[in-house]
């Protein structure tokens, strides 16, 4: 059987080391068990089974992240250290519980602080986010996983993260039951396991792809500034 050769061969070194950063926006502090953190750990374990990686799980509730849009908003601000981790990561997992049908306040704070990188891109045409792969992890004891997933995906896409197919894993427990009582169900849930495995496979594949074939920014500064000007223009 005749097989055509790809016009542009895609050489992806299988042993390319990857940095994977998981940002847990649970409102619980250490040492309390975080359901979101447990699912993030499951995804990270799947990633480690696939590739040579360095993984780190950061619990945002244990950091000091003041309100604001700059790189440093107070004398005590952990954002500069956190943004360094984000810049050196190949894959960033955005992990949040569902609170009142939406993402947690800490996930919203993270998104707001990331605006500093978006503004840097607008001003300089150089992006610290382009070429990075994003994944999403969600847990909760109420409905809303798909809504939260979609809203986060929209933000990350506009910021410049690459979102592979099936790049999210979630688990939603029985309404009215504390998620701590559902722990064993969560850890055995086949659909959640399938999503975690698919998420890991896809973020690793696309991270390797972009490492081997980095994106080229096309008129980054002008394009981004033009987009901002369009969004700021009064509606007719």
Pin down the residues of each PLM region.
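Juxtamembrane/interfacial segments around transmembrane helices
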Residues: 135, 179-191
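Long, compositionally biased intrinsically disordered regions
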Residues: 175-177
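N-terminal beta1-alpha1-beta2 submodule of the flavodoxin-like/Rossmannoid cofactor-binding fold
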Residues: 1-124, 186-236
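Short, glycine-/small-residue-rich phosphate/pyrophosphate-handling segment
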Residues: 125-173, 191-194
């Amino acid at each position: 059987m005749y097989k055509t050769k790809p016009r542009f061969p895609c050489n992806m070194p299988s042993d390319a080391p990857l940095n994977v950063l998981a940002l847990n926006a649970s409102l619980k502090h250490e040492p309390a068990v975080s359901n979101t953190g447990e699912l993030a750990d499951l995804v990270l374990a799947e990633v480690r089974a696939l590739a040579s990686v360095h993984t780190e799980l950061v619990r945002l509730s244990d950091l000091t992240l003041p309100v604001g849009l700059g790189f440093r908003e107070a004398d005590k601000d952990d954002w500069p250290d956190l943004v360094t981790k984000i810049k050196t990561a190949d894959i960033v997992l955005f992990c949040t519980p569902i609170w009142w049908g939406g993402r947690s306040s800490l996930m919203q704070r993270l998104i707001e602080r990331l605006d500093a990188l978006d503004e840097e891109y607008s001003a300089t045409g150089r992006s610290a986010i382009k070429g990075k792969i994003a994944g999403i992890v969600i847990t909760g004891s109420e409905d809303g996983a798909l809504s939260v997933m979609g809203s986060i995906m929209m933000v990350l896409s506009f910021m410049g993260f690459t979102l592979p197919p099936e790049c999210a894993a979630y688990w939603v427990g029985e309404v009215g039951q504390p998620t701590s009582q559902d722990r064993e169900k969560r850890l055995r849930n086949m659909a959640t396991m399938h999503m975690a495995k698919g998420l890991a496979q896809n973020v690793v594949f696309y991270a390797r792809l972009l490492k081997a074939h980095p994106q080229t920014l096309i008129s980054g500064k002008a394009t981004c500034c033009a987009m901002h000007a369009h969004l700021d223009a009064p509606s007719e």
